[in-house]
Amino acid sequence: MTVGRAESPELVAVLAGRRIAVLTGAGISTDSGIPDYRGPESPPSNPMTIRQFTGDPAFRQRYWARNHVGWRHMDDTLPNAGHRALAALEDAAVVTGVITQNVDLLHTKAGSRNVIDLHGSYARVICLGCGDTTSRAALAERLEALNPGFIERTEAIGGLAVAPDADAVVAETASFRYVDCARCAGMLKPDIVYFGESVPKDVVAAAYRLIDESDTLLVAGSSLTVFSGYRFVRHAAARGIPIAIVNRGDTRGDHLATVKVDGGCSELLALLADELSPLPTH
């Protein structure tokens, strides 16, 4: 059943009185100013693959130059009404937790406590050699020391576009100097699951567990194009629990949905926060 965006009684009816596991994608963050790779109005985008990153020093140089600018914009981004609604529903014991395909940390910023960052976080960096992790802010200090004035020169041009993985469009990257791991001189990479990488098994297991402990699955702002998210819809369907999808445009999981609402996440999640009654916490 598909209902128009202005109607939501069916959505509320499917979710009312149930403990809800939530799966979110890029569509929930567009109202915070972060673009969607695959939304119906998104421009063509070619996200980086892990093979490109590890196999080509020039590609890494270009990537780190762009990320050096882009991560700050991601860090300054604020959650929107959709993120805040899910945090409020968790406080009301309605939402059991959020599985997010986003790396923007906006659920955590909004106050959600049980968040599974399926694809990692823009705010951490990991060494592919020794596995050491550090904050992106600490790496920024090292990069700034090697590239004084780079950010100012880039932002002076104006019209900066930042992708969902904190990759900014920067024209001049050939002079940028990047660094290796301070501990072992290994290759550093943002702690983000890139195209061609697998989500860590323990993270996948935690997401399955969250769905198993819930009475229904709500998908918000994901086209479910990649299997890393779609598998959880299949898992919920195999368990026989209701599935509700809120998204602008079609999704890969529409045929499995109990109810699908074509509309924006901010408005519809805020509506759910108003309509769904708190549940007992025992």
Swiss-Prot record:
Residue ranges annotated for the Deacetylase sirtuin-type domain, each copy included: 1-282
Gene3D superfamilies the UniProt entry points to: SIR2/SIRT2 'Small Domain (3.30.1600.10), TPP-binding domain (3.40.50.1220)
Record InterPro entries: DHS-like_NAD/FAD-binding_dom, NAD-dep_sirtuin_deacylases, Sirtuin, Sirtuin_cat_small_dom_sf, Sirtuin_class_II, Ssirtuin_cat_dom
GO terms assigned for molecular function: histone deacetylase activity, NAD-dependent; NAD+ binding; zinc ion binding
Residue sites binding Zn(2+) per the record: C127, C130, C181, C184
Cellular compartment(s): Cytoplasm
E.C. designation(s): 2.3.1.286
Cofactor mode of binding and number, as noted: Binds 1 zinc ion per subunit.
SUPFAM superfamilies reported in the protein's UniProt record: DHS-like NAD/FAD-binding domain
Cofactor(s) this protein requires: Zn(2+)
Catalytic activity: N(6)-acetyl-L-lysyl-[protein] + NAD(+) + H2O = 2''-O-acetyl-ADP-D-ribose + nicotinamide + L-lysyl-[protein]
Binding annotation for NAD(+): 25-45, 101-104, 221-223, 247-249, 265
EC top class named in words: transferase
Keywords: Cytoplasm, Metal-binding, NAD, Transferase, Zinc
Keyword flag Transferase: yes
Catalytic residue positions: H119
PANTHER family recorded: NAD-DEPENDENT PROTEIN DEACYLASE SIRTUIN-5, MITOCHONDRIAL-RELATED (PTHR11085:SF10)
Function field: NAD-dependent protein deacetylase which modulates the activities of several enzymes which are inactive in their acetylated form.
Family: Belongs to the sirtuin family. Class II subfamily.
Name the record gives this protein: NAD-dependent protein deacetylase 1
Organism whose genome encodes this protein: Mycobacterium avium (strain 104)
